[in-house]
């Protein structure tokens, strides 16, 4: 069983990893003039254009108001457009513009660079194990939420 000191080191290690990951992610997204969260929204729309704002919020695990503000900035930048659903006027759907679609290749390149930096020096089996452990930790954290 880990003593308190060792548990504290785990917390410190996870914090350092999260900060380094966020910092590198921000740096890479800055190169293509996007914020990390905007890139994540665009990735969701690359997979399923026309999602509702609430679907985006749910998939990104953020508050609806956060997505509304972010989408406003993205709309102002010409990356997305928002339109009322034709069948259910209560819903607002989000669509990629041509400028938003044009970002896909650049975003994927940056995410591949990020992934490469994170997993540099890892074998395929180590990468698979790390993914498994992270997913297990996330599942457990979801149960606690």
Regions found by a protein language model. Give the residues of each.
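Short, locally clustered residues in the helix-turn-helix/winged-helix DNA-binding domain
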Residues: 15-18, 43-47, 108, 135
């Amino acid at each position: 069983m880990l003593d308190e000191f060792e548990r504290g080191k785990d917390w410190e290690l996870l914090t350092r990893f999260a900060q380094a990951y966020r910092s590198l992610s921000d740096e890479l997204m800055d190169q293509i003039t996007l914020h990390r969260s905007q890139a994540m929204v665009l990735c969701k729309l690359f997979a399923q254009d026309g999602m509702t704002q609430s679907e985006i919020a749910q998939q990104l695990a953020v508050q609806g108001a956060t997505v509304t503000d972010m989408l406003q900035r993205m709309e102002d930048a010409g990356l997305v457009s928002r339109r009322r659903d034709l069948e259910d006027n209560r819903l607002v759907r989000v669509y990629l513009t041509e400028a938003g679609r044009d970002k896909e290749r650049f975003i994927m390149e940056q995410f591949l660079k990020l992934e490469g930096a994170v997993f540099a020096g890892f074998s395929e089996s180590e990468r698979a194990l790390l993914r498994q452990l992270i997913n297990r930790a996330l599942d457990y954290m979801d149960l606690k939420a």
